Amino acid sequence: MQSTKQKIERAALAGLAAASMDERERSTDISLAELAALVETAGGQPVVTLLQNKPTPDPRTFLGEGKVAELHERIVANDCDLAVFDNELSPSQMRVLEEELGVRVLDRSGLILDIFA
């Protein structure tokens, strides 16, 4: 996120509530609201929210391929600059998602580090 007087980054928020995840790792409406507040703290504007319920995370894209496509459509339609995931992503998942979504991708931990940088 940029904290200078440059263009405010528009963020798409995404999360996964997988049955195979520990309860504290699952995204919920409450955790996505907290994520939106973190984005605002970092100087961004949350404009899109997507929550997927799925048995297990996709090892390649974390969300299912259909949800990744839906998120991409929402990112384009809402002129988003950034996608922020409520869950921890692996470096390879972040790389694949950046390629698929066409925007910078952060997870919750990366966003928090960005706030305190």
Segments from the language model and where they lie:
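N-terminal accessory targeting/assembly segments
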Residues: 1-114
